[in-house]
Amino acid sequence: MNSMKSLQTTQINLNTILLKKITLFIVFFHFLPTSYGQIIDGLSVGFESNSAWYNDDKKTGDFTDEANNDQDKHFRANNYLKIDYNFLSKFTASVQIESYEPFALINYSTNFKGTNLGTYSLHYKTSNMDATIGHFYEQFGSGLILRNWEDRQLGINNALFGGKVSYRLMDAVDLTALYGNHRVGFETSDGTIFGFNSEFELDSVFKWDETALNIGFSYVGREEKIDLENPNFEPTTNAFSGRVDFSYRNFYSSVEYVTKSEDAIVQVNQVSNDFIKSGNGFLLNTGYSKKGFGLDATFRRLENMSFYSDRKKSGNVFFENIINYTPGLTKQHDYLLTNIFVYQAQSAVSFLDPGLLKVGEIGGQLDLFYNIKKETLLGGKYGTKMAFNASYWAGLKGTFDYANQDYETDVFGFGEKYFSDISLEIRKKWNPKWRSIVYFVNQYYNKKEIEGNFGAKPIVTNIGVVESTHKLGKGKSIRIEAQRLWSDTQDHDWIGGTFEFNLSSKISFYINDIYNNGDDSSTSKTHYYNAGGSYTKGATRVGLNYGRQRAGLVCIGGVCRFVPEATGLTATVTMAF
């Protein structure tokens, strides 16, 4: 009897999925041209597959997936099929089919499960109008008030499902209005997002040649039902943004300010009815660049800028329901040992313990690029490229009242130091076949403040990297890296290396390893080795890797996802046609 009920339930689910897919294709393709040749001309398809077979390993431990309560299904795969069809010159129908079977890769959100339609949309575009119904992505300004994007490696897809219209006036004014709910797995958020954006290109109005001046204003609202009796805050939270972008010849500058209305503070998925605060953000970027020289400086201050479509999702590690974009503004390093201690932006309020009170961050970074000219003492025959970066981040200074759950902050006061990073990179070409990179990094990482680890002390590290590439001719080359990390504790004493062989522009192989000779209980005396290769032809790329994955953060563009320690075989396939 139970088996019969289970079979009937499965059949109902399958019928529901099939009905959704059939309905979608009827809507999208009802008005499409019937000619096969016309269909092929307007069709573009992209496919991506990321899969892994996780091994039991005496060093990294037996395979287990606590989130899905599974220890048996060692094979996992994330697959994406994206189809875009352009028809009647102005319309584009898009659909993305996703499969996470039998489960998604380790430490992706459990909302990504099974096989289903991930996103679908119908897009209309003319010379001055752009409209979308279905799933869409958008960004207002720098993203400090709103950003929707997809990053498959990080497991992020916070597309909005609803509608968006953009209109351009007089070749100088851009207006956008949107309404929708966040994508959460294959479902949508309870909270609703609506917003308006305007951009004014004043240089186009005044016909300036060497000067660019743009101003922008944005509004974003979030409405979510409140499940509390007599709430002290409104269901709707309003955010406003104003910004100016200016450039003149080699100089550029931009400034943006965001304010967020009062809303409940959320901690550990609990919405507080007594801790109600507003939020704000300030971002300033300025720089100067010319041939052989560049200088760029960024300053940012965030106070209570955690912003989610569903309040209880605040601070979730999968970035589900996130409305705005607050990446860590530090240098994005390329090497294994320079990415062990990575800074993540501290934009939220945390009053969980009187010994750890946080309400935001303040700091910035400086980038300096300089090319030493050829035929000089330091430049040599081919010149020398130098890049310097420094970043510093701290908590907000102010008065904090843990007992009454309240605070007041100083506008430009720097509190507890969170993180600093100073790096120097020197690139040198010795002859047509040999080139090298020398890289040095000094980092300060306040583990207690960043991770909420009360027993941890700040870690200071110095990292050195030497890299050389030698061209062998006929597309062949070898690349060698040597890395070393020293710290002020006995826990971290790392060494690493990489060897890469490029057989041609299409085929490459590599092997790398990092090893901690320190006393850290989670990583000590373990070789985190990897070996693999890739093949590329046109828009198709196939990659294969076997090795160990160190527990830590994978970061792209200042946004990070935690990955657990694991051992296994991974494969990636990307295709476009």
Task: Tell what function each PLM region has.
Residues 40-42, 53, 58-76, 86, ...:
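Signature for the C-terminal beta-barrel architecture of outer-membrane proteins
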Residues 91-98, 131:
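Short N-terminal amphipathic alpha-helices
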Residues 117-118:
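Extended catalytic core of nucleotide-activated donor transferases of GT-like folds
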Residues 122-169:
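Well-ordered mid-protein domain cores that form the structural environment of catalytic cofactors
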